[in-house]
């Protein structure tokens, strides 16, 4: 069954110890699901010993206990640096049982002690209000992967081993999870791994055959197809299949020895010879029954080996005495008296199977990455400043400027190998081409003549899968490193749900004192909604921000720097920060530059502010506030202000620019929120505010609805109008252009009288002229293309 | 190169015609990218003939033109019913060129006539403001798949062929797209296809080797691995590899004959013998150079066969005369004078290669699915009504009731086979088990003893991939059928981006008179945020609604029925509707029933209304409005009202329930929006409104910020607090529970005085009691579990 010549022998005695360890973990798992008392079954089981609400999942648990016990043996024997990723959902009972058995659980939670009293608490807390969930949740030591949402285990595992040459991640992939898209493409991660400078992932595809109520695809194709699939993905599969425990122990022990042997041999070869060409890494296919060792039948229906074992197999002991009897038989089938001493502690000869100290998978520092976090070395972002010869001078594209800053971050941290850039083939397209001056795209598939910036090692990872980019980066961050995900704004929605889960992970871990803070997850969304000139409607969606701000205020930050110097300041801040999700939206096309570096740093530190030089207010309140957030809205707002000041010189205008979107929220809602008095000082208590916003306009209303002056805030933003057209026409289609903004202001300012109405008429003429011009010429009018900021009043 | 014994011969003459057709399409493609005039090159090319803004994508185009020409020959020869799905992004020039050549384009757009004048317009409109995008956009006849966002071509194709036994979808899969997760798992769709009752998908994996700036993975693994991968996915690959046009024509023609032969033989066998066991369907791997036939070098850098050909190879003819020269040479290399007559019409002997009438891929009715749409036969939803013995009587779980209604829709439409249910293994979990009384899960992988509800044909498709469910359903709807996607609320975020694209597709097609309306995309989100008792925090996310309401108001509808009778009424409405996206959020757990069928139908028709029987107002305005939206918020609101009415009998309370969320928006913003006077009549102009909401609370503010009484609307909803706990405790953690709602009301009603304060103190005690009780018992207090509605005042 095992396809190898280099098999090793594991003694029968060791196999018996593994079996005992497995039984102990199974016992503790069933105990978690069922017992509120009588944890050692010192007396016959009574209904009072059983939890009133039976919640939890058994199906995947015995298989994961089996794997964990075998990994313990292998780690100890080979002194491996290994962590465990539990891909199948609902593996909670297994990882909790095992970290408890190895001692790492009680070290973190001393009240869950390794004795009868602690075991009782261990059982009671599981799936209990105020207790712990049934996944490999953040509360569980050794976990970097929750498993609540399926599909990301392999991506997280690869993220963990990049730049960790000694680390092996044992990644259990559920056969349900394997049907998801993200997992199906994650097998290709092996084309991005360097065997010399990265660690290894050992995938263990766990074919227990069923999901919630269905068989799984990979369990229902024949052996030949499954083997071809894994080989086609570039892996060497080792099959372990069956259900007889002792035969399976022998097969699994041998499979692991073969796999570890192959990993070591691949790594040794690459590291000694420098030959880093892509190896065929080993992986294990473990086919074992769902709900293995659980009840064979429940109420006359087959349970072990079917989807009926997915949750709680015997679900109604209160009403059905037969269930209670079966639960007791099931628990006693593990012969707990052989495994645990009378105080409930695992017998030493069994406990010795597991490694000790930080080699325990529940105590490995890589699984609590903040412990390993080293601050990034950062150049002074001010050194990359754009010279502002005059307000509004044309830059080279804001992200291109930041690209040089990031290039030097790459360079400065080359030694520690703890910074990476991820993107779906868009790092150049997003304007970060400068990084390729100092590094390459890491790529381990074939390289041919004429390829550019591809190499076996490099700081940039590009695969056309936003899921992979996100999953790799999350794994990289969770193991204590730093990184950046650059992505088209519209398509970052592809990872909405992954973002949700990571934000939830950060929220929960921030409340666990033993979890050290990790580096922030930084998104750079260049190629944004307003500049999809050649891509059109499908590439226009600024709604990721709406998804982000739904998450806990302590975790999420959103920045929309208006120019290159502001972007530098913001990126510097984000890359230094910890335990946030930072979303930065910035442009890549040549666009006006407004603030000197000093002004930008000050403006970004405040996150919001009045641009005195753009407005013309005196000491009293202005007549109108022109607010803007985002690079394109800032341009259109300043162009509108320029028109207003020229044509209505008596009007006093205040210009407010927003970089840190969270400043708009009340302080009670977000730590960055402005106090009401500060907000009122900026936006006035009663003047009209014409607000040009980068994203969907109602997001501003959602953030400001409690503010004094909210009824006077009028927001323009993207409203799902667009196609392939000119950059300026995109703003026209969404009423965000300078002409509309001027008209909006006049509509709110009846006191502008006849002059206002004449200016409005002029604006309408301009819009007609614009439409005619682009229809004839396919580009914007010269007065738009060549526009320069001036404040003539 | 072709792996088959049954090869056929295509005459050399035919191959030459195919080549001519291909050259014509290539000529028209390059023309679209470059030319504003001189479409037939009747004079030497001048810079004035070239567009000022050069936008578009060449890289994928010649390969797709190659495929389309070969498909034309095959369709005509075999009288195939075939449509074309363009998976690679930016195949716009190819599909536009080909539908123009075959005549379907000019039939829809008569001004783009098949002559020199029309050709000039065809060229000018491409990637031009007000023109057409560079994808296979909705504007292009024959398209059901835009391709702007990558990854869904195969899923759409399979959706199209379910229940269309005569249809073949030729699906071009880009090798960039093939890296995405959704595409990587979509290959497994063959495990769900019935060769007798469904049609066939012929995937053509187009390995042109490059993405935007990178090679692709599948082009850089060796032949053996690629073949293993495709075989592992269950396909039989046929390889066509090379770059010499005439050799490639011969190979491709033969490959298609083999593939079509295999498809027909598989279908014939299944249909004649009844053996529907899973066949190995054929697929084609076409390896050809990116930018094939384009310039070999540009500015000294290799272009054809590299990623440099991705967009516009010669990008600056205005400044670089050499570019202009090369453009002309490139265009003339296709020898247009051999292909087009002097009026610009394709010569008849070449045009004859293509099929005619509805066999043309641009005219096939399946690609304009509304043409084939047949109304669903619907039973009377009132027949499934829940008897309301008294207000608040406990139901069996709302979706379980609707399950029977849907079961009978399945039954009634069995004959026409135009209704399907899609879900990621959750149809039973979401409460729709009744459908398995009359149908099965369609499944074509192995079936073994003890399997339940699996069969080669069935109306339910379940794969653990939300992407697949969504993609299949979209393909099914786009080809003129009906369906339902049932999904856990939290995990529907996985398809946020697919929803975005489908909503955009619906918006654009609704503006094209020749595009017939299709059935709505219906989501049933059961297993919602408030009832994740055993799944916890990762399964709690009601934010899909925020994503949905960002899209065009004409397209999106959101319903939150409070009980089973309302759910029946809503589902009836949604399944009859066209060209919307309907999102329905409903519960599956036993919960109180409020409205008789008659009341429910009336309430849902209005979408919002006062529940007189719950409040106690007299003719004048009430003291407070207690509003609710969603089943759990409605329960907690009514429980709060019950407490308020008992303890503060002098208080007059109005209860408003919202089913149709869009009613909250102003009429100007959404067609369902209430007028301001109607809104004021419900919510008053100045009374406090305590609003209990299903999702994130700020969504209500976003919808109502323009309303008269907005400042008095106080919303409770999910605020990212939760874990494994009791159902009621979930509401407590988010301040949405009855006790908090009572306290909220009292806080806003100082006139309740000492009695109010005493009630508030009582509520605080209740919360303490609740916390203590669940900590001790792991379940809710009896007074919560056994609560029954009563209005004692």
Curated annotation (Swiss-Prot), chains A, B:
Q: Which GO terms describe its molecular function?
A: aldehyde-lyase activity
- The species is Rhodopirellula baltica (strain DSM 10527 / NCIMB 13988 / SH1)
Q: Which family does it belong to?
A: Belongs to the XFP family.
Keywords, A to Z, come to: Lyase, Thiamine pyrophosphate
Q: Which InterPro entries match?
A: Phosphoketolase (IPR023962), THDP-binding (IPR029061), Transketo_C/PFOR_II (IPR009014), Xul5P/Fru6P_PKetolase (IPR005593), Xul5P/Fru6P_PKetolase_C (IPR018969), Xul5P/Fru6P_PKetolase_CS (IPR019790), Xul5P/Fru6P_PKetolase_N (IPR018970), Xul5P/Fru6P_PKetolase_ThDP_BS (IPR019789)
Q: Give its E.C. classification number.
A: 4.1.2.-
Instruction: Please list which residues make up the signal peptide.
Output: none
Cofactor(s) demanded: thiamine diphosphate
Keyword Lyase (UniProt)? yes
Listed GO biological process terms: carbohydrate metabolic process
What is the protein's name according to its record?
Probable phosphoketolase
EC class of the enzyme, as a word: lyase
């Amino acid at each position: 069954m095992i396809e190898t010549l280099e098999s090793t022998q594991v003694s029968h005695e060791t196999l018996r110890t593994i079996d005992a360890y497995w039984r102990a973990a199974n016992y503790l798992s069933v105990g978690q699901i069922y017992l509120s008392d009588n944890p050692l079954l010192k007396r016959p089981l009574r209904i009072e010993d059983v939890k009133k609400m039976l919640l939890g999942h058994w199906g995947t648990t015995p298989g994961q206990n089996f794997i964990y016990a075998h990994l313990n043996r292998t780690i100890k024997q080979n002194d491996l640096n290994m962590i465990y990723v539990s891909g199948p959902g609902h593996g909670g009972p297994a990882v909790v049982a095992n970290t408890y058995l190895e001692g790492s659980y009680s070290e973190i939670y001393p009240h869950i002690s390794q004795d009868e009293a602690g075991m009782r608490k261990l059982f009671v807390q599981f799936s209990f209000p105020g207790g712990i969930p049934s996944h490999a949740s953040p509360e569980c030591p050794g976990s970097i992967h929750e498993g609540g949402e399926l599909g990301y285990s392999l991506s997280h595992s690869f993220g963990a081993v990049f730049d960790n040459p000694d680390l092996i991640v044992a990644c259990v992939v559920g056969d349900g999870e394997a049907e998801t898209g993200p997992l199906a493409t994650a097998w290709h991660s092996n084309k991005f791994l360097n065997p010399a400078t990265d660690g290894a992932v050992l995938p263990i595809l766990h074919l227990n055959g069923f999901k919630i109520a269905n068989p799984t695809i990979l369990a229902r194709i024949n052996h030949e197809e499954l083997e071809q699939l894994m080989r086609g993905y570039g892996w060497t599969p080792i099959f372990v299949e069956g259900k007889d425990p002792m035969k399976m122990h022998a097969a699994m022990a041998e499979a692991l020895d073969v796999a570890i042997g192959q990993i070591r041999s691949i790594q040794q070869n690459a590291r000694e010879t420098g030959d880093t060409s892509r190896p065929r890494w080993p992986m294990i296919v473990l086919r074992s029954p769902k709900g293995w060792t659980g009840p064979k039948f429940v109420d006359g229906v087959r349970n072990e080996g079917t989807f009926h074992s997915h949750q709680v197999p015997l679900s109604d002991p209160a009403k059905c005495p037969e269930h209670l009897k079966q639960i007791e038989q099931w628990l006693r089938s593990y012969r707990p008296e052989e495994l645990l001493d009378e105080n409930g502690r695992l017998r030493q000869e069994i406990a010795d199977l597991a490694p000790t100290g930080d080699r325990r998978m529940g105590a490995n520092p890589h699984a609590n990455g903040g412990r390993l976090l080293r601050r990034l070395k950062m150049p002074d972002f001010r050194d990359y400043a754009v010279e502002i010869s005059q307000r509004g001078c044309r830059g080279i594209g804001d992200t291109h400027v930041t690209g040089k800053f990031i290039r030097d971050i790459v360079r400065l941290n080359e030694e520690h190998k703890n910074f990476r850039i991820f993107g779906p083939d868009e790092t150049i397209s997003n304007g970060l081409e400068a990084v390729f001056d100092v590094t390459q795209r890491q790529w381990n598939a074939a390289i041919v003549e004429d390829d550019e910036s591809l190499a076996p090692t490099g700081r940039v990872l590009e695969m056309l899968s936003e899921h992979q980019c996100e999953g790799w980066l999350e794994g990289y961050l969770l193991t204590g490193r730093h990184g950046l995900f650059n992505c088209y704004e519209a398509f970052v929605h592809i990872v909405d749900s992954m973002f949700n889960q990571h934000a939830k992970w950060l929220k929960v871990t921030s409340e666990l004192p033993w979890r050290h803070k990790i580096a922030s997850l930084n998104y750079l969304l260049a190629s944004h909604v307003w500049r999809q000139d050649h891509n059109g409607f499908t590439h226009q969606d600024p709604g990721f921000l709406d998804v982000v701000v739904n998450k806990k205020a302590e975790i999420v930050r959103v920045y929309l720097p208006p120019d290159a110097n502001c972007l530098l300041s913001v990126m510097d801040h984000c890359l230094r920060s910890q335990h946030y999700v930072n979303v930065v939206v910035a442009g890549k096309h040549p666009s006006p530059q407004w603030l000197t570096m000093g002004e930008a740093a000050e403006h970004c530190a405040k996150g919001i502010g009045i641009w005195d030089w753009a407005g013309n207010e005196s000491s009293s309140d202005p007549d109108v506030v022109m607010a803007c957030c985002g690079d394109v809205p800032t341009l259109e707002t300043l162009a509108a202000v320029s028109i207003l000041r020229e044509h209505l010189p008596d009007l006093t205008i205040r210009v407010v620019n927003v970089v840190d979107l969270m400043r708009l929220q009340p302080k009670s809602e977000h730590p960055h929120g402005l106090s009401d008095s500060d907000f009122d000082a900026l936006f006035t208590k009663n003047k009209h505010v014409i607000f040009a916003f980068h994203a969907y306009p109602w997001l501003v209303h959602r953030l400001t609805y409690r503010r004094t002056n909210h009824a006077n805030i009028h927001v323009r933003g993207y409203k799902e109008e667009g196609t392939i057209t000119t950059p300026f026409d995109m703003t026209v289609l969404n009423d965000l252009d300078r002409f509309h903004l001027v008209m909006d202001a006049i509509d709110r300012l009846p006191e502008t009288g006849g002059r206002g109405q004449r200016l409005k008429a002029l604006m309408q003429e301009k819009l007609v002229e614009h439409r005619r011009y682009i229809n004839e010429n396919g580009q914007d009018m010269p007065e738009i293309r060549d526009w320069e900021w001036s404040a003539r009043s």
